[in-house]
């Protein structure tokens, strides 16, 4: 293990992604997660893909190049460790560990998609299977497992290119185990974004992997309930964090598109939440294409907001979605290329 203190940059960087948890789960919940993770070894391995949802994740080419160079920037911390596997970084920072176990960095390596990037993606993915695939380690939380499954399904060709039959079997065996874990533990994910992420991962796996379609209908119904309970009538969420709301919209459009692409209709409450959120985010869009920054949210990756809004527009049947009055408690003024967004709402819950 490599002590992170040897590699810390002089100045911590701004967080890359929105934190999805207000704290650690209770000890009892963690014990139940650990038990379910260990029991996931009883799951039947998936044999292959029925179909793969079209990859919709957006990675950063620049961050991907930094990862290849050995610069790991997660959770507001930059660790410089050239030639060190990602699982050997010992930061002692739970948020850092959550981000690497969620595999969102796989989007960045796929954005580079050259030989060195693919080598690292494969080494780190199969390294995770070797070290943690039997239910060990901090990555067995429902929201992290859902996030990881989405990336593994999206980038399966990237990860499996040139792999041996034994490695391919290990990959599908791990997908089956993680799907079983999610099916048992998604309810324990915190309500809102973490639970939506867990359910979206379960839907992706159920639609994509042979023999797992039984999980799709219950997960789709649960996602619709979460939409009804957590997205208010104005398309807002309790945290009032614009970037977190963009995360929610992104996951909902991914799930809806995957369901539609497989010939299944998304639930009415699911589509209604997308229709409510989109105009709220459009009102929070700055002239440069980024989000207004409030309550811990950042502007988002270039092109992320526009892609999410375009997908929401397509799912709405091409209907114009426009906010009227305040949007999640924010007011907007605009003239030409100048926009002003004002927080005029109650404090976040």
What label would you give each PLM region?
Residues 67-69, 82-84, 100, 328, ...:
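Sequence-level motif detector for i,i+2 pairs with an aromatic at +2
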Residues 57-81, 178-181, 185, 218, ...:
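Preference for long, amphipathic alpha-helical scaffolds in soluble/luminal domains
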Residues 1-82:
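Extreme N-terminal leader/anchor segments
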Residues 93-274:
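Aromatic-lined, polymer-binding surfaces characteristic
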Residues 232-349:
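Carbohydrate-active enzyme catalytic cores, enriched for enzymes
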Residues 2-3, 88, 94, 146:
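CBM-like, beta-strand-rich accessory domains located in the C-terminal region of large
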Residues 74-77, 81-96, 110-112:
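Asp/Glu-centered strand-loop micro-motifs enriched in Gly/Pro and often flanked by an aromatic residue
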Residues 76, 89, 107, 334-335, ...:
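Pocket-edge structural micro-motifs
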């Amino acid at each position: 293990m490599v002590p992170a203190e040897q590699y810390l940059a002089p100045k911590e960087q701004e967080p890359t992604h929105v934190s999805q948890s207000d704290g650690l789960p209770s000890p009892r919940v963690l014990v139940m997660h650990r038990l379910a993770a260990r029991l996931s070894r009883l799951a039947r391995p998936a044999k292959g893909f029925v179909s793969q949802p079209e990859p919709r994740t957006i990675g950063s080419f620049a961050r991907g190049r930094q990862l290849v160079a050995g610069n790991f920037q997660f959770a507001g911390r930059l660790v410089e460790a050239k030639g060190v596997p990602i699982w050997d970084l010992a930061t002692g920072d739970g948020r850092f560990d959550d981000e690497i176990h969620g595999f969102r960095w796989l989007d960045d390596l796929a954005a580079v998609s050259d030989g060195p990037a693919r080598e690292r993606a494969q080494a780190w993915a199969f390294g995770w299977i070797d070290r943690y695939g039997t239910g060990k380690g901090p990555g067995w939380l429902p929201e992290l497992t859902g996030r990881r499954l989405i990336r593994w399904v999206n980038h399966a060709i990237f990860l499996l290119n040139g792999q041996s039959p034994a490695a391919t079997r290990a990959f599908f065996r791990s997908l089956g185990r993680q799907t079983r874990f999610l099916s048992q533990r998604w309810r324990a994910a915190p309500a809102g974004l973490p639970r939506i992420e867990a359910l979206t991962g379960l839907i992706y796996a159920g639609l994509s992997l042979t023999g797992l379609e039984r999980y799709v209908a219950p997960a789709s119904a649960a996602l619709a309930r979460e939409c009804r309970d957590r997205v208010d009538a104005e398309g807002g969420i309790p945290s009032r964090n614009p970037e977190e709301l963009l995360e929610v919209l992104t996951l909902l459009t991914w799930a809806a598109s995957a369901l539609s692409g497989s010939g299944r209709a998304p639930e009415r409450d699911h589509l209604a939440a997308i229709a409510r959120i989109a105009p709220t985010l459009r009102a929070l869009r700055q002239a440069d294409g980024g989000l207004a920054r409030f309550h811990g949210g950042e502007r988002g990756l270039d092109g992320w907001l526009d892609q999410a809004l375009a997908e929401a527009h397509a799912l709405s049947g091409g209907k114009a979605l426009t906010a009227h009055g305040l949007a999640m408690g924010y007011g907007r003024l605009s003239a030409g290329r100048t926009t002003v967004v004002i927080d005029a709402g109650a404090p976040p819950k």
